[in-house]
Amino acid sequence: MEHTTTHNNDPLVLGGRALESRLFIGTGKYGSDSLIPRVAEASGAQVITVALRRVDMQAAAGNVMQHIPQHMQLLPNTSGARTAEEAVRIARLARAAGCGDWIKIEVISDSRYLLPDGYETAKATEILARDGFVVLPYMNPDLYVARDLVSAGAAAVMPLGAPIGTNRGLRTQEMIGILIEEIELPVIVDAGIGRPSQACEAMEMGAAACLVNTAIASAGDPVLMASAFGAAVRAGRRAWLAGTGAVLEGQAQASSPLLGFLDS
């Protein structure tokens, strides 16, 4: 695959918005919500996701929304939804509350492993896309589910790298690679990424972006970790744009001549 775009002109376009940063961050699990603006600044992220169930629009204080920088693109999610109908209701409530038209669909009826329901996710995606939402569905990295989501009107697909909150890394790497090759939508790796090196690897594969929450929020120094993830995502993207060298099997190949220079 030939990559002609340079890193100086390489926006990720979603919902009509050109994003310079390909790192998305979350708002959960921080010891204090007051860390969120510092994490956002350190990461360079432009998109931030928040569970609507954590938002109290009537509260004068203690509202996570107060800590989200105004320049950031808000990506409400439907965490807590168990059916398509519940996800649609949450999305419409978010829009009515002034949270915009972007929505991350999470439909999870499995409370142990927190794996997304592909059928219900596609159903919700179709309804909300018709309603004018920019729909980013969280999904298992399954090609057939991804194709259903494309047909349903998704703006991107968000396959999990590992179960939510586990920091296990890219356990589904080969399946994500298939989606990157086959799906004509941005592939945003979501859930399970635990280290900056793993985010870098996802970007080197050709992922359009990474969403990272737990790995940053649970770090000893979340602000410094956010900076590390921002740098890793940029490095991985530049490596993909540059085109990595071929992997040789069998014998080694010298990078400079081994013979002849002593005879000259």
UniProtKB/Swiss-Prot annotation:
It is found in: Cytoplasm. CDD domains: ThiG. The active site is at K104. SUPFAM superfamilies: ThiG-like. Pathway: Cofactor biosynthesis; thiamine diphosphate biosynthesis. Keywords: Cytoplasm, Schiff base, Thiamine biosynthesis, Transferase. Pfam families: ThiG (PF05690). 1-deoxy-D-xylulose 5-phosphate binds at G165, A191, G192, N213, T214. One of its GO terms (molecular function) is thiazole synthase activity. It catalyses: [ThiS sulfur-carrier protein]-C-terminal-Gly-aminoethanethioate + 2-iminoacetate + 1-deoxy-D-xylulose 5-phosphate = [ThiS sulfur-carrier protein]-C-terminal Gly-Gly + 2-[(2R,5Z)-2-carboxy-4-methylthiazol-5(2H)-ylidene]ethyl phosphate + 2 H2O + H(+). GO terms for cellular component: cytoplasm. One of its GO terms (biological process) is thiamine diphosphate biosynthetic process. HAMAP family: ThiG. This is Thiazole synthase. It comes from Oleidesulfovibrio alaskensis (strain ATCC BAA-1058 / DSM 17464 / G20). The gene is thiG.
